[in-house]
Protein backbone atom coordinates (compact mmCIF):
# COMPACT_ATOMS: atom_id res chain seq x y z
CA UNK A 1 0.00 0.00 0.00
CA UNK A 2 1.32 3.42 -0.96
CA UNK A 3 0.47 6.53 1.05
CA UNK A 4 0.42 9.64 -1.13
CA UNK A 5 0.33 13.18 0.23
CA UNK A 6 0.90 15.28 -2.89
CA UNK A 7 -1.40 15.96 -5.83
CA UNK A 8 1.55 15.74 -8.23
CA UNK A 9 2.50 12.22 -7.14
CA UNK A 10 -1.14 11.10 -7.17
CA UNK A 11 -1.53 12.30 -10.76
CA UNK A 12 1.59 10.41 -11.82
CA UNK A 13 0.22 7.14 -10.44
CA UNK A 14 -3.27 7.72 -11.86
CA UNK A 15 -1.78 8.43 -15.28
CA UNK A 16 0.14 5.15 -15.15
CA UNK A 17 -2.90 3.18 -14.01
CA UNK A 18 -4.94 4.67 -16.85
CA UNK A 19 -2.27 3.72 -19.37
CA UNK A 20 -2.38 0.16 -18.01
CA UNK A 21 -6.15 0.07 -18.48
CA UNK A 22 -6.87 -0.47 -14.78
CA UNK A 23 -10.36 0.06 -13.38
CA UNK A 24 -10.12 2.44 -10.41
CA UNK A 25 -12.40 2.70 -7.38
CA UNK A 26 -12.42 5.66 -4.99
CA UNK A 27 -13.56 5.60 -1.37
CA UNK A 28 -13.64 9.18 -0.03
CA UNK A 29 -13.36 9.42 3.78
CA UNK A 30 -12.42 11.84 6.52
CA UNK A 31 -10.53 9.16 8.41
CA UNK A 32 -11.21 7.78 11.90
CA UNK A 33 -12.17 4.60 10.07
CA UNK A 34 -14.52 1.93 11.42
CA UNK A 35 -16.20 -1.22 10.09
CA UNK A 36 -18.63 0.87 8.06
CA UNK A 37 -15.72 2.30 6.09
CA UNK A 38 -14.27 -1.18 5.67
CA UNK A 39 -17.54 -2.24 4.05
CA UNK A 40 -17.03 0.57 1.53
CA UNK A 41 -13.50 -0.69 0.89
CA UNK A 42 -14.71 -4.25 0.38
CA UNK A 43 -17.32 -3.05 -2.11
CA UNK A 44 -14.67 -1.02 -3.93
CA UNK A 45 -12.31 -4.00 -4.13
CA UNK A 46 -15.10 -6.11 -5.61
CA UNK A 47 -15.81 -3.45 -8.23
CA UNK A 48 -12.36 -2.47 -9.52
CA UNK A 49 -8.74 -3.48 -10.06
CA UNK A 50 -7.28 -0.70 -7.93
CA UNK A 51 -8.68 0.96 -4.79
CA UNK A 52 -7.82 4.51 -3.74
CA UNK A 53 -8.99 5.62 -0.29
CA UNK A 54 -8.80 9.33 0.42
CA UNK A 55 -8.41 10.53 4.00
CA UNK A 56 -9.01 14.24 4.31
CA UNK A 57 -10.80 16.21 7.01
CA UNK A 58 -12.34 18.77 4.69
CA UNK A 59 -12.58 22.22 6.31
CA UNK A 60 -15.07 23.40 3.68
CA UNK A 61 -17.84 21.13 4.95
CA UNK A 62 -17.70 22.11 8.62
CA UNK A 63 -20.11 24.84 9.66
CA UNK A 64 -18.50 25.16 13.10
CA UNK A 65 -14.80 25.78 13.76
CA UNK A 66 -14.88 23.86 17.05
CA UNK A 67 -16.36 20.81 15.29
CA UNK A 68 -13.53 20.87 12.74
CA UNK A 69 -10.90 21.25 15.47
CA UNK A 70 -12.07 18.27 17.50
CA UNK A 71 -12.77 15.88 14.63
CA UNK A 72 -10.55 12.82 15.30
CA UNK A 73 -7.35 12.52 13.23
CA UNK A 74 -6.14 8.90 13.36
CA UNK A 75 -4.10 8.56 10.18
CA UNK A 76 -1.62 5.95 11.39
CA UNK A 77 -4.34 3.68 12.76
CA UNK A 78 -6.44 4.22 9.63
CA UNK A 79 -3.56 3.24 7.35
CA UNK A 80 -2.93 0.08 9.36
CA UNK A 81 -6.57 -0.94 8.90
CA UNK A 82 -6.46 -0.19 5.17
CA UNK A 83 -3.20 -2.07 4.72
CA UNK A 84 -4.79 -5.17 6.26
CA UNK A 85 -7.60 -4.77 3.69
CA UNK A 86 -4.97 -4.66 0.90
CA UNK A 87 -5.90 -1.19 -0.30
CA UNK A 88 -3.59 -0.02 -3.09
CA UNK A 89 -3.33 3.72 -2.43
CA UNK A 90 -4.17 6.10 0.40
CA UNK A 91 -4.40 9.75 -0.60
CA UNK A 92 -3.89 11.77 2.60
CA UNK A 93 -3.17 15.39 1.66
CA UNK A 94 -2.93 18.41 3.94
CA UNK A 95 -5.49 21.23 3.63
CA UNK A 96 -2.76 23.37 2.03
CA UNK A 97 -2.25 20.70 -0.64
CA UNK A 98 -5.95 20.57 -1.46
CA UNK A 99 -6.64 24.30 -1.10
CA UNK A 100 -3.34 26.09 -1.90
CA UNK A 101 -5.05 29.50 -1.82
CA UNK A 102 -7.18 28.69 1.22
CA UNK A 103 -10.90 28.01 1.18
CA UNK A 104 -12.24 31.57 1.05
CA UNK A 105 -11.49 32.11 -2.63
CA UNK A 106 -11.92 28.47 -3.62
CA UNK A 107 -14.06 27.73 -6.67
CA UNK A 108 -16.92 25.60 -5.45
CA UNK A 109 -19.53 23.19 -6.75
CA UNK A 110 -23.08 23.75 -5.54
CA UNK A 111 -26.02 21.41 -6.09
CA UNK A 112 -29.17 23.57 -5.98
CA UNK A 113 -32.03 22.36 -3.85
CA UNK A 114 -30.40 19.28 -2.37
CA UNK A 115 -27.62 21.30 -0.75
CA UNK A 116 -29.92 23.65 1.17
CA UNK A 117 -32.89 21.46 2.13
CA UNK A 118 -33.26 19.14 5.13
CA UNK A 119 -29.78 18.62 6.64
CA UNK A 120 -28.46 21.48 4.53
CA UNK A 121 -30.90 23.94 6.09
CA UNK A 122 -29.44 23.38 9.55
CA UNK A 123 -25.82 23.19 8.36
CA UNK A 124 -25.24 26.13 5.98
CA UNK A 125 -22.44 25.50 3.50
CA UNK A 126 -21.96 21.88 4.54
CA UNK A 127 -23.12 20.24 1.35
CA UNK A 128 -21.41 22.84 -0.82
CA UNK A 129 -18.19 21.77 0.90
CA UNK A 130 -19.02 18.11 0.32
CA UNK A 131 -19.80 18.51 -3.38
CA UNK A 132 -16.70 20.65 -3.90
CA UNK A 133 -14.24 18.19 -2.34
CA UNK A 134 -15.87 15.17 -3.96
CA UNK A 135 -15.75 16.87 -7.35
CA UNK A 136 -12.09 17.70 -6.77
CA UNK A 137 -11.30 14.10 -5.78
CA UNK A 138 -13.13 12.85 -8.87
CA UNK A 139 -10.95 15.08 -11.04
CA UNK A 140 -7.73 14.00 -9.31
CA UNK A 141 -8.37 10.25 -9.01
CA UNK A 142 -10.46 9.83 -12.19
CA UNK A 143 -12.27 6.80 -10.77
CA UNK A 144 -14.51 4.45 -12.70
CA UNK A 145 -16.51 3.82 -9.54
CA UNK A 146 -16.89 5.56 -6.17
CA UNK A 147 -18.41 4.13 -2.99
CA UNK A 148 -20.47 6.09 -0.45
CA UNK A 149 -22.38 4.98 2.63
CA UNK A 150 -26.16 5.09 2.71
CA UNK A 151 -26.08 6.39 6.30
CA UNK A 152 -25.51 9.86 4.84
CA UNK A 153 -28.61 9.51 2.67
CA UNK A 154 -28.90 13.12 1.55
CA UNK A 155 -25.18 13.26 0.76
CA UNK A 156 -25.50 10.19 -1.46
CA UNK A 157 -28.46 11.73 -3.29
CA UNK A 158 -26.49 14.95 -3.75
CA UNK A 159 -23.47 13.11 -5.17
CA UNK A 160 -25.66 11.16 -7.60
CA UNK A 161 -27.23 14.38 -8.86
CA UNK A 162 -23.87 16.12 -9.17
CA UNK A 163 -22.48 13.21 -11.19
CA UNK A 164 -25.52 13.24 -13.49
CA UNK A 165 -25.57 17.02 -13.92
CA UNK A 166 -21.81 17.41 -14.46
CA UNK A 167 -21.49 14.47 -16.83
CA UNK A 168 -19.02 12.46 -14.76
CA UNK A 169 -18.58 8.96 -16.20
CA UNK A 170 -18.47 7.43 -12.72
CA UNK A 171 -20.59 4.66 -11.24
CA UNK A 172 -21.79 5.65 -7.77
CA UNK A 173 -22.33 2.72 -5.40
CA UNK A 174 -24.40 3.22 -2.27
CA UNK A 175 -23.36 0.82 0.49
CA UNK A 176 -25.90 -0.16 3.19
CA UNK A 177 -25.54 1.09 6.76
CA UNK A 178 -23.35 -1.05 9.00
CA UNK A 179 -24.70 -1.36 12.52
CA UNK A 180 -23.41 -2.51 15.88
CA UNK A 181 -25.16 -5.56 17.35
CA UNK A 182 -27.46 -3.27 19.32
CA UNK A 183 -28.57 -1.44 16.18
CA UNK A 184 -26.53 1.75 16.46
CA UNK A 185 -25.31 2.91 13.06
CA UNK A 186 -21.52 3.00 12.98
CA UNK A 187 -20.15 6.53 12.80
CA UNK A 188 -16.89 8.30 13.52
CA UNK A 189 -18.88 10.62 15.79
CA UNK A 190 -19.89 7.73 18.06
CA UNK A 191 -16.47 8.26 19.63
CA UNK A 192 -17.83 11.45 21.21
CA UNK A 193 -20.22 9.38 23.37
CA UNK A 194 -19.49 8.64 27.01
CA UNK A 195 -19.95 5.07 28.25
CA UNK A 196 -23.39 5.91 29.65
CA UNK A 197 -24.44 7.70 26.48
CA UNK A 198 -23.32 4.74 24.38
CA UNK A 199 -25.83 2.59 26.29
CA UNK A 200 -28.59 5.05 25.41
CA UNK A 201 -27.55 5.52 21.76
CA UNK A 202 -29.29 2.42 20.29
CA UNK A 203 -32.57 4.07 21.27
CA UNK A 204 -32.30 6.18 18.12
CA UNK A 205 -32.64 3.12 15.92
CA UNK A 206 -35.51 1.79 18.06
CA UNK A 207 -37.48 5.00 17.55
CA UNK A 208 -36.59 4.98 13.86
CA UNK A 209 -37.82 1.40 13.53
CA UNK A 210 -41.09 2.25 15.28
CA UNK A 211 -41.70 5.02 12.75
CA UNK A 212 -40.89 2.62 9.91
CA UNK A 213 -43.43 0.11 11.21
CA UNK A 214 -46.16 2.75 11.30
CA UNK A 215 -45.47 3.82 7.73
CA UNK A 216 -45.35 0.24 6.49
CA UNK A 217 -48.71 -0.39 8.14
CA UNK A 218 -50.26 2.47 6.17
CA UNK A 219 -50.24 5.26 8.77
CA UNK A 220 -49.93 8.60 6.95
CA UNK A 221 -50.46 10.99 9.87
CA UNK A 222 -46.92 12.26 9.41
CA UNK A 223 -47.06 15.22 11.79
CA UNK A 224 -48.36 13.00 14.56
CA UNK A 225 -45.82 10.25 13.84
CA UNK A 226 -42.97 12.77 13.97
CA UNK A 227 -44.24 14.43 17.16
CA UNK A 228 -44.44 11.07 18.94
CA UNK A 229 -40.95 10.12 17.73
CA UNK A 230 -39.51 13.42 18.99
CA UNK A 231 -41.14 12.88 22.38
CA UNK A 232 -39.80 9.32 22.59
CA UNK A 233 -36.28 10.46 21.76
CA UNK A 234 -36.37 13.20 24.37
CA UNK A 235 -37.69 10.77 26.99
CA UNK A 236 -34.80 8.40 26.24
CA UNK A 237 -32.24 11.14 26.92
CA UNK A 238 -31.69 12.48 23.40
CA UNK A 239 -32.34 16.01 22.22
CA UNK A 240 -34.34 15.52 19.05
CA UNK A 241 -32.90 17.70 16.29
CA UNK A 242 -34.70 16.87 13.06
CA UNK A 243 -37.03 14.14 11.86
CA UNK A 244 -38.20 14.10 8.27
CA UNK A 245 -40.27 11.63 6.26
CA UNK A 246 -39.69 12.15 2.55
CA UNK A 247 -39.96 10.45 -0.81
CA UNK A 248 -36.88 8.24 -0.96
CA UNK A 249 -36.37 8.88 -4.66
CA UNK A 250 -36.73 12.67 -4.73
CA UNK A 251 -36.33 13.77 -1.07
CA UNK A 252 -39.43 15.89 -1.62
CA UNK A 253 -42.55 15.58 0.51
CA UNK A 254 -44.54 12.38 0.16
CA UNK A 255 -47.35 12.28 -2.40
CA UNK A 256 -49.94 9.68 -3.31
CA UNK A 257 -47.58 8.60 -6.09
CA UNK A 258 -44.62 7.97 -3.74
CA UNK A 259 -43.55 4.34 -3.73
CA UNK A 260 -40.81 4.53 -1.10
CA UNK A 261 -40.37 6.74 1.93
CA UNK A 262 -37.14 7.54 3.71
CA UNK A 263 -37.15 8.43 7.39
CA UNK A 264 -34.29 10.81 8.17
CA UNK A 265 -33.57 11.18 11.87
CA UNK A 266 -31.04 13.35 13.70
CA UNK A 267 -30.67 13.78 17.45
CA UNK A 268 -28.09 15.08 19.88
CA UNK A 269 -26.75 12.84 22.62
CA UNK A 270 -24.25 14.78 24.68
CA UNK A 271 -21.66 16.21 22.28
CA UNK A 272 -22.55 13.81 19.46
CA UNK A 273 -25.08 14.57 16.76
CA UNK A 274 -26.26 11.14 15.62
CA UNK A 275 -28.02 10.54 12.30
CA UNK A 276 -29.77 7.49 10.93
CA UNK A 277 -32.30 6.59 8.26
CA UNK A 278 -34.54 3.82 7.02
CA UNK A 279 -36.31 3.26 3.72
CA UNK A 280 -39.88 1.96 3.77
CA UNK A 281 -41.79 0.55 0.81
CA UNK A 282 -45.23 2.13 0.84
CA UNK A 283 -48.40 0.16 0.24
CA UNK A 284 -50.13 1.43 -2.89
UniProtKB/Swiss-Prot annotation:
It catalyses: (R)-pantoate + beta-alanine + ATP = (R)-pantothenate + AMP + diphosphate + H(+). Beta-alanine binds at residue 61. One of its GO terms (biological process) is pantothenate biosynthetic process. GO terms for molecular function: ATP binding; pantoate-beta-alanine ligase activity. One of its GO terms (cellular component) is cytosol. Belongs to the pantothenate synthetase family. This is Pantothenate synthetase.
Amino acid sequence: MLIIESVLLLRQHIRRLRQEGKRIALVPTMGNLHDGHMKLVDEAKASADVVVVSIFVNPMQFDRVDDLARYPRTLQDDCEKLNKRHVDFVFAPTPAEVYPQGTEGQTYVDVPGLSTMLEGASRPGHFRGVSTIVSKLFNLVQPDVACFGEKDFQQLALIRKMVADMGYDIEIIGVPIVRAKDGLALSSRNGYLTADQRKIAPGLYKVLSAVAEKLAAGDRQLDEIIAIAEQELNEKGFRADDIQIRDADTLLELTDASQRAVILMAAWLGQARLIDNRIVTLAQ
